[in-house]
């Protein structure tokens, strides 16, 4: 149990630190759809897709690795709450087009990146 807790905590801390760094460095570049938040969600989508594909072909790997990467790191990196707050701010400002664009970009982009992660990992593994 403690190994699982430590794996999740370590992964989450690393993912959250990366998300914070991306926001700090990139979000001021385009406040309407902050690129740091978007990049965190896209990278997290790709990483979780690749991890799912990898762990599916390697069932003997200790479950703590899956917890560290998928539950911890990807969970700490991706951010539905920040994305939601940014969209609500756009809606409150009456910027409906930007809000719709942000929703489409984050949700569609994250789904596409997850599929890309799955397909690319399967390709690299020869599956």
From Swiss-Prot:
Primary subcellular site in the record, as a coarse category: membrane
Keywords from the UniProt entry: Cell inner membrane, Cell membrane, Ion channel, Ion transport, Membrane, Metal-binding, Sodium, Transmembrane, Transmembrane helix, Transport
Any single GO BP term: cellular detoxification of fluoride
GO molecular function, one term: metal ion binding
Function of the protein: Fluoride-specific ion channel. Important for reducing fluoride concentration in the cell, thus reducing its toxicity.
Domain of life assignment: Bacteria
Catalytic activity: fluoride(in) = fluoride(out)
Topology relative to the membrane: Multi-pass membrane protein
Cellular component annotations (GO), alphabetically ordered: plasma membrane
Bilayer-spanning residue ranges: 4-24, 36-56, 68-88, 99-119
Compartments where found: Cell inner membrane
Family membership: Belongs to the fluoride channel Fluc/FEX (TC 1.A.43) family.
Organism: Pseudomonas paraeruginosa (strain DSM 24068 / PA7) (Pseudomonas aeruginosa (strain PA7))
Binding site for Na(+): 75, 78
Regulation: Na(+) is not transported, but it plays an essential structural role and its presence is essential for fluoride channel function.
Protein name: Fluoride-specific ion channel FluC
């Amino acid at each position: 149990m403690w190994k699982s807790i430590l794996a999740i905590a370590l992964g989450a801390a690393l993912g959250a630190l990366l998300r914070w760094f991306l926001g700090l460095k990139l979000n001021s570049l385009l406040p309407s759809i902050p690129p740091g938040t978007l990049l965190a969600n896209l990278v997290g989508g790709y990483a979780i897709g690749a991890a799912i594909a990898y762990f599916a072909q390697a069932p003997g790997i200790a479950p703590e690795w899956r917890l560290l990467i998928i539950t911890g790191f990807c969970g700490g990196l991706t951010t539905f709450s920040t994305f939601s707050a940014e969209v609500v701010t756009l809606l409150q400002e009456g910027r409906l087009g930007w809000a719709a664009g942000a929703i489409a970009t984050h949700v569609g982009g994250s789904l596409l990146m997850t599929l890309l992660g799955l397909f690319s990992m399967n390709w690299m593994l020869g599956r």
